[in-house]
Amino acid sequence: HKEEELLGSSGGPPPEEPPKEGNPAEINVERDEKLIKVLDKLLLYLRIVHSLDYYNTCEYPNEDEMPNRCGIIHVRGPMPPNRISHGEVLEWQKTFEEKLTPLLSVRESLSEEEAQKMGRKDTEQEVEKFVTSNTQELGKDKWLCPLSGKKFKGPEFVRKHIFNKHAEKIEEVKKEVAFFNNFLTDAKRPALPEMKPAQPPGPAQILPPGLTPGLPYPHQTPQGLMPYGQPALPIFGYGAGAVRPAVPTGGPPYPHGPYGAGRGNYDAFRGQGGYPGKPRNRMVRGDPRAIVEYRDLDAPDDVDFF
């Protein structure tokens, strides 16, 4: 009965009619395990050699800078649980090919003139260099082939010996030349970025440590903008004499007087005479790591002790 049902000659369901125009047919997605293994090898080759992630339709141009090289690869999604229409398959193929076309298109290589300027090698010349470097003169009518250690009466015999007995060495030279030329003419060859020399900062750009352009006062600078390991600078004039840069800058240290840069001393930021209009804050302390300075108890009380 099953055969009759398949043939449609018996009481089974009628044979399926071909889809009418405008109604796409539904199809089942099938998997071929042998073809999938071949496909996976090709996709892995694209990923490892060309940094091309096929299923994500993207390329990783700066893979050498990534934490884990070849650490990202997208794989096939799960099989669709339901039957899909033929139109959906065609639409998916069209969209996928449009995304892959820019990645798989052949890029222009260097012209012969540009390649010559960049050091393109000639196969025949490189072979001649190899033969010449392996033809050593020991004395009159005595020549040596260092590849085999045999001696000959003339350089022409050494040359013939190399081509006959060491043909594999000649092929290695040709392969090296082809590899070098292919690398040279590859528009996507890896190369170090061009480093532009940094312009020395002008006088107006030199700021004390902890000061950021656009933020004139240290107490207005967010702590997140301070260099790592460097304490926040105090408010102008209060404990400034005890501040030292966390990293040596090569310049002279901040000037400090015998009384901790009080009102009568020169301050590196505000000049002499104090910062007008700001009330003194007795709770603000200087750098806790500052050097303990000697204070003369007989000296006039010029600073506030806290």
Curated annotation (Swiss-Prot):
Keyword Ribonucleoprotein: no
Record has Phosphoprotein as a keyword: yes
GO CC entries: cytoplasm; nuclear body; nucleoplasm
Gene Ontology biological process terms in this record: neuronal stem cell population maintenance; primary miRNA processing; regulation of DNA-templated transcription
Primary gene name: SRRT
Keyword annotations from UniProtKB, A to Z: Activator, Cytoplasm, Methylation, Nucleus, Phosphoprotein, RNA-mediated gene silencing, Transcription, Transcription regulation
Compartments reported by the entry: Nucleus, Nucleoplasm; Cytoplasm
Protein name per UniProt: Serrate RNA effector molecule homolog
Residues with Phosphothreonine modification: 101
GO molecular function: DNA binding
Highest rank taxon of the organism: Eukaryota
Subunit structure: Interacts with CASP8AP2, ERBB4, NCBP1/CBP80 and DROSHA. Interacts with LUZP4. Interacts with NCBP2/CBP20 and NCBP3.
Role: Acts as a mediator between the cap-binding complex (CBC) and the primary microRNAs (miRNAs) processing machinery during cell proliferation. Contributes to the stability and delivery of capped primary miRNA transcripts to the primary miRNA processing complex containing DGCR8 and DROSHA, thereby playing a role in RNA-mediated gene silencing (RNAi) by miRNAs. Binds capped RNAs (m7GpppG-capped RNA); however interaction is probably mediated via its interaction with NCBP1/CBP80 component of the CBC complex. Involved in cell cycle progression at S phase.
Modification Omega-N-methylarginine occurs at: 263, 270, 280
Annotated segments matching region Disordered: 1-28, 251-284
Pfam family of the protein (one): ARS2
Family listed: Belongs to the ARS2 family.
InterPro entries cross-referenced by the UniProt entry: SE/Ars2 (IPR039727), SERRATE/Ars2_C (IPR007042)
Transmembrane segment boundaries: none
Modified residues (Phosphoserine): 109
